[in-house]
């Protein structure tokens, strides 16, 4: 409420009530992303999720339809210090109408995206929903599927449009993607296989399976790979040299999961 000069008599004042929403009071995830600077995104991330590093990428999107929600999802630039420990908890902060229900809702992200941080705010959820009920909640499952699709879509865009950034991402979290291809008997392999990369013997640079197949010379009918500690050592193996002598490239499998992930595909078109 503020006073303005009255028009009836000089010196008279009348009361007017002005309803204003201060932009600074609107949660970041509810703002239009065109109004938010990179610095604001980064500062919010570092403050909210106690990270000293700027995030590698930000996925800010709204969904309307079967599930209506606002969300900001961050891909860290480095693995959390406890990421590979039993103490690490995956999950996104879950809100309903700006009120937090849970600090880390594990049901919102699959294990292969366990590294992401973020916030989801939906008006479709009951404020009193319990942790046990969440697992069976239809809306939560719909939201989780939408988030999964969005992260996959944004990673594919990054791979296509910003190769350098994607390779940085894959250096840090590529093993998670490969485990995602292999786990649950390959249930998610079709959505993740084109996000996998491996170093090749030919130039010691990352290639996707699609790129490898597209560059196969005439006469090559198989994908060749070799396991070892590092591409430099794999290149010196007699078996590798026998294949490269034919003009065929060899993929370097340096993580334990690599062979399992590719075998889960059975074949690659």
What are these regions (language model features)?
Residues 1-269:
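Conserved GHKL (Bergerat-fold) ATPase module
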């Amino acid at each position: 409420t503020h006073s303005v000069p009255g028009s009836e008599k000089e010196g008279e004042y009348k009361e007017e009530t002005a309803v204003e929403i201060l932009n600074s009071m609107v949660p970041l995830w509810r703002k239009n992303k065109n109004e938010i600077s990179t610095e604001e995104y980064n500062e919010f991330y570092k403050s909210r999720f106690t990270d000293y590093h700027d995030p590698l990428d930000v996925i800010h999107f709204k969904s309307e339809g079967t599930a209506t929600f606002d969300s900001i999802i961050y891909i860290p630039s480095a693995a959390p210090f406890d990421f590979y420990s039993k103490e690490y908890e995956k999950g996104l902060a879950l809100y309903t109408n700006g009120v937090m229900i849970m600090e880390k809702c594990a049901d919102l992200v699959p294990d292969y995206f366990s590294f992401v941080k973020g916030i989801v705010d939906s008006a479709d959820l009951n404020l009193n929903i319990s942790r046990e009920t969440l697992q069976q909640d239809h809306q939560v499952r719909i939201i989780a599927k939408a988030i999964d699709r969005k992260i996959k879509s944004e990673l594919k865009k990054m791979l296509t449009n910003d190769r350098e950034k994607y390779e940085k991402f894959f250096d840090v979290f590529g093993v998670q993607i490969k485990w995602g291809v292999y786990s649950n008997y390959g249930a998610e392999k079709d959505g993740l296989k084109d996000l996998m990369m491996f170093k090749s013997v030919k130039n010691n640079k990352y290639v996707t399976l699609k790129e490898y197949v597209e560059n196969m010379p005439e006469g090559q009918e198989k994908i060749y790979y070799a396991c070892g500690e590092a591409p430099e050592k794999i290149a010196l193996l007699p078996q590798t040299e026998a294949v490269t002598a034919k003009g065929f490239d060899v993929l370097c499998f340096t993580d334990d999961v690599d062979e399992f992930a590719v075998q889960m595909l059975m074949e690659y078109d």
